[in-house]
C-alpha cells in the first residue's frame, strides 16, 4: 500500500495499515519536520482518535484551557475547555515516527509524479531527487492535502484556475496584555467574512490570523492592527504565513483502489473551524474499509463511503449553517446569543462525557 502525504491523515492511515499487516510506504513531498499554516489546536478527544497519548514534550509549553468569543456587537463570552496545543512541524514528525515504529517505510522529499490504476492495483510513479521509480501497490491513499496531486490526477475539474481566497497568520513575539492560556475567537465580519479570526499563543509566539475569499491581506492587516491596539502589542512580527487552494468545496472519496482522506478528500468543516479530527478519523476508516474489502472481496470505495457517511452529512449540514450565520452581522450575532451559547456549552459537556466511553471510530466531533 502507498500513502501519499505525511501529515495527520497520511501518518495515521499508514500506521494503522501496518498494524493491520499491510506492507506500507508513506511518502512526503517535503523535508521533515516542516511548518504548516494550521492552528495546531484540538480538543482532548483527539488523542483517542490518533490512538496515542501525546507526550508532553510534543506539546507547546503554554496550555490552552480558556476560550474567549467576541461577537459582532462586542459582547464577550468566556468559557473553559481543555485543549491540545502543538506545532504541526513537531506533531506531524512525531506521527511519522510512530508510523515507522509500526513498520511503515517513510520517505520524505519524495513526490508522486503519476499513478495508473488497474483492476488489481495501482502503479505509483515516485521521484526522490534525481531518482525515479515505479511502485506496484494494491491500494493508493491520497492524503496530500488541498493541493492534492492524487485528486488532481483523477478529478482535475475539482480545481479552479485561481484560488478563491486564503488564510493568513502573523507570528508575533513580544509583550502584550493577552492571556497566554486563552484561545481568542473574533466573530466579526470586518475581520473575517467566512469564519472567526483567531489569536493564541504557542510557546513564546503569538499567532494572529484570519481568512477571506477576497483581499485576505487587507483583512489580515486590519485584524493585526486591531489586536495591536486593543491588547498593547509591543514587539515584532517574525513571520507571515498563508495558505490558499484552488480545490472546490466538494467531497471526493476516491474510486477503484484509490481512496482519498483528510483535506485531500474535502473533509474540512469550516463551521467548526477544524479539519484535523476529520483527517485522523478518515485515515482510520480508510484502512478499516480496505481490511473489510480484502476479507469480503467487496468494493472498497463503497465500504469507505458507508463508513464516512456521518462525517460527510455533518460537513454538509454545517456548511449550510455557516452560510446562514454569516448572511449579516445580525444573523451572526443571533447565532452567538446567550441561549445558543448555553445550548452549545451543554452539548459540548455531554459530547465530552460520551467521548470517554465511545469507541474511537464513533467519537462525537466537537463542537456540535
Predicted regions and their residues:
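Beta1/beta-strand and adjacent pyrophosphate-binding region of the FAD-binding site
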Residues: 1-9
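Predominantly flavin-linked oxidoreductase catalytic cores and closely associated redox partners
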Residues: 6, 98-233, 266
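Glycine-rich FAD pyrophosphate-binding loop
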Residues: 6, 16-37
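A short alpha-helix-loop-beta-strand transition element characteristic
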Residues: 32-34, 50-66, 159-164, 301
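A conserved beta-strand/loop capping segment in the N-terminal third of enzymes
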Residues: 41-96
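Short loop/edge segments at beta-strand edges and connector loops
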Residues: 93, 108-110, 239-241
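FAD/FMN-dependent oxidoreductases across multiple families
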Residues: 113-114, 214-289
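C-terminal helical "tail/cap" subdomain of flavin- and related membrane-associated enzymes
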Residues: 291-368
Amino acid at each position: 500500500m502507498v500513502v501519499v502525504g505525511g501529515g495527520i491523515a497520511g501518518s495515521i492511515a499508514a500506521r494503522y495499515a501496518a498494524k493491520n499487516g499491510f506492507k506500507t510506504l508513506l511518502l512526503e513531498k517535503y523535508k521533515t519536520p516542516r511548518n504548516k499554516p494550521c492552528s495546531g489546536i484540538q480538543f482532548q478527544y483527539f488523542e483517542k482518535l490518533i490512538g496515542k497519548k501525546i507526550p508532553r514534550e510534543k506539546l507547546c509549553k503554554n496550555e490552552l484551557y480558556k476560550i474567549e468569543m467576541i461577537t459582532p456587537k462586542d459582547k464577550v463570552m468566556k468559557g473553559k475547555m481543555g485543549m491540545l496545543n502543538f506545532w504541526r512541524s513537531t506533531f506531524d514528525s512525531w506521527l511519522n515516527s510512530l508510523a515507522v515504529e509500526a513498520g511503515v517505510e517513510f520517505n520524505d522529499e519524495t513526490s508522486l509524479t503519476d499513478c495508473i490504476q488497474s483492476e488489481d492495483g495501482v502503479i505509483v510513479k515516485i521521484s526522490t531527487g534525481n531518482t525515479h521509480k515505479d511502485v506496484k501497490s494494491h491500494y493508493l491513499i491520497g492524503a496530500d492535502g488541498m493541493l492534492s496531486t492524487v485528486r488532481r490526477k483523477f478529478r482535475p475539474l475539482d480545481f479552479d484556475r485561481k484560488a478563491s481566497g486564503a488564510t493568513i497568520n502573523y507570528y508575533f513575539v513580544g509583550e502584550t496584555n493577552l492571556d497566554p492560556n486563552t484561545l481568542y475567537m473574533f466573530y466579526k465580519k470586518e475581520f473575517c467574512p467566512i469564519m472567526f479570526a483567531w489569536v493564541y499563543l504557542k510557546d513564546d509566539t503569538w499567532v494572529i490570523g484570519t481568512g477571506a475569499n477576497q483581499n485576505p491581506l487587507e483583512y489580515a492587516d486590519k485584524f493585526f492592527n486591531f489586536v495591536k491596539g486593543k491588547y498593547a502589542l509591543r514587539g515584532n512580527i517574525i513571520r507571515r504565513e498563508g495558505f490558499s487552494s484552488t480545490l472546490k468545496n466538494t467531497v471526493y472519496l476516491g474510486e477503484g483502489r484509490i481512496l482519498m482522506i483528510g483535506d485531500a478528500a474535502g473533509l474540512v468543516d469550516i463551521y467548526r473551524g477544524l479539519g484535523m479530527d476529520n483527517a485522523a478519523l478518515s485515515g482510520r476508516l480508510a484502512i478499516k474499509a480496505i481490511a473489510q474489502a480484502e476479507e469480503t472481496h467487496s468494493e472498497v470505495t463503497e465500504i469507505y463511503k458507508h463508513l464516512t457517511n456521518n462525517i460527510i452529512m455533518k460537513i454538509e449540514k454545517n456548511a449550510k449553517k455557516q452560510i446562514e450565520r454569516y448572511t449579516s452581522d445580525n444573523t451572526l450575532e443571533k447565532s452567538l446569543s446567550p441561549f445558543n451559547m448555553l445550548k452549545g456549552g451543554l452539548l459540548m459537556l455531554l459530547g465530552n462525557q460520551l467521548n470517554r466511553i465511545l469507541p474511537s471510530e464513533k467519537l462525537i466531533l466537537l463542537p456540535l
